[in-house]
């Protein structure tokens, strides 16, 4: 029995999804807490010039922990310690995102070693803020929910750990 492709869902503006993509894309994002207790936010065109957190796609064969360390280093130049679970969210054809997409947003809260940020070309600005100052910014919706999680739990969540077993990929693995 053959399966027909899932029907393409259109974004609110009528744009079609990425060709060939019929499944959600896993991403990681980090709310970073400095040694002074301030939170790092970045402003990006991808989210309608709203403020959010550094992060991006999880590469094939990469653990979530590896992905968050890589994305944060690429986008901010920061290294992380004490990486803790945050909320897992979904963004399905989110109107704030610049193109039709379906993301599974795997969020973490982590400490940085400092506040010396070097942005790459994905972000236009950054700010270290108190939670109250962060809430006053034009945050994208997923970041607003992540900030609410941080206000409730702080860094008091389980640590994100590497997978206990890593096997080799086999031909035909999806």
Task: Locate predicted features.
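Conserved Nudix-box catalytic region and its N-terminal flanking loop in Nudix hydrolases
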Residues: 37-75, 174
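NUDIX/MutT-family hydrolases
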Residues: 118-150
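Conserved beta-strand segments that form the floor/walls of ligand-binding pockets within enzyme
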Residues: 52, 107-109, 138
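Short, well-ordered beta-strand micro-motif
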Residues: 32, 107-111, 130
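Charged phosphate-binding loop/patch that engages nucleotide di/tri-phosphates or the phosphate backbone
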Residues: 144-174
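Acidic, metal-coordinating catalytic segment for phosphate/diphosphate chemistry
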Residues: 2-31
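Active-site segment of metal-dependent pyrophosphate-handling enzymes
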Residues: 26, 77-115
């Amino acid at each position: 029995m053959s399966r027909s492709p899932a029907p393409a869902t259109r974004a609110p503006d009528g744009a079609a999804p990425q060709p060939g993509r019929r499944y959600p894309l896993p991403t990681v994002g980090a709310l970073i807490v400095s040694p002074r207790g301030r939170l790092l936010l970045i402003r990006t065109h991808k989210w309608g010039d709203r403020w959010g957190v550094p992060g991006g796609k999880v590469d094939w064969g990469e653990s979530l922990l590896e992905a968050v360390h890589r994305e944060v280093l690429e986008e901010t130049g920061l290294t992380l310690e004490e990486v803790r679970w945050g909320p897992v969210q979904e963004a399905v054809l989110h109107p704030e995102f610049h193109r039709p997409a379906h993301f599974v947003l795997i969020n973490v809260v982590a400490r940085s070693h400092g506040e010396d940020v070097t942005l790459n070309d994905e972000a236009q600005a950054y700010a270290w803020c108190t939670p109250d100052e962060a809430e006053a910014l034009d945050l994208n919706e997923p970041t607003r929910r992540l900030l609410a999680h941080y206000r409730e739990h702080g860094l008091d969540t389980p640590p994100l750990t590497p997978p206990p077993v890593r096997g080799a990929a086999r031909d035909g693995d999806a």
